[in-house]
Regions:
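Short, Lys/Arg-rich, polar N-terminal cytosolic tail immediately upstream
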Residues: 1-16
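Membrane-interfacial segments
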Residues: 43, 69, 100, 141-145, ...
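Alpha-helical transmembrane segments of polytopic integral membrane proteins
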Residues: 62, 89, 165, 169-172, ...
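N-terminal membrane insertion elements
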Residues: 118-124, 131, 135-176
Length: 211
């Protein structure tokens, strides 16, 4: 006898999709807050203020578009959305004039997300796409390079990006606890099945087991 193992049901896939959605919303809120703080202090020009509503709207658009294709191949959808996030990261760094603190925070959020999703391989892909898009935008647009980041902008950027990392790490920890609980339940079911098999072996002849 074999115990019934939990499968990747539509419900579990939906939970994973919602977790990815909320994570992306938090990440883009952190980026939008950095841009809003920079424009408020007149560190960034008002010409890039459109990036704030875009950062707030894109995660919802990505979620609804991804849901159409996630049932066929969820891993490809996740990687494709991560690649788009990497393009946005490079685009944001270039349009912000490669401001030190926001650019580093953008890269930190992107790297952390890539490591959580797929390890070093996806991290390398994300950094390569981000660097390529940043270089392309810098060549085409030639934005002015900004100097030291003001304290207000740096504080907002670090605060929101740190909040994103802490919340994501917390949910990852909770997922690990649930996984450990499921493994314990599977182990108990296996032990129960083994005891049942031993008890049946006492009453059934060897010819029955060979059938």
């Amino acid at each position: 006898m074999k115990p019934t193992l939990p499968d990747r049901s539509p419900t579990s896939r939906s939970v994973a999709s919602m977790r990815e959605y909320y994570s992306r919303v938090l990440a883009y809120i952190a980026c939008g807050a950095s841009i809003a703080a920079g424009t408020y202090t007149q560190y960034f020009s008002y010409g890039i203020l459109w990036m704030v509503p875009y950062a707030l709207l894109y995660p919802h658009l990505a979620y609804h578009l991804g849901q159409r294709f996630r049932q066929h191949d969820p891993r490809k959808v996740t990687r494709a959305l991560l690649a788009v996030d990497a393009v946005h990261c490079g685009l944001g760094m270039a349009l912000l004039g490669f401001s030190v603190v926001p650019s580093l925070m953008f890269l930190l959020v992107l790297s952390f997300t890539a490591l959580v999703i797929g390890g070093l391989r996806l991290l390398g892909m994300a950094l390569l796409v981000s660097a390529s898009s940043a270089l392309l935008v810098a060549v085409l647009v030639a934005p002015p390079l900004l100097g030291n980041t003001p304290v207000e902008v740096a504080a907002v950027s670090i605060l929101f990006c740190g909040l994103y990392i802490c919340i994501t790490a917390f949910f990852g920890h909770q997922q690990g606890l649930r996984l450990a609980q499921v493994r314990q339940e599977i182990a108990r079911e296996q032990e129960k099945a083994a005891r049942l098999a031993r008890n049946l072996a006492k009453y059934l002849s060897p010819q029955v087991w060979e059938m």
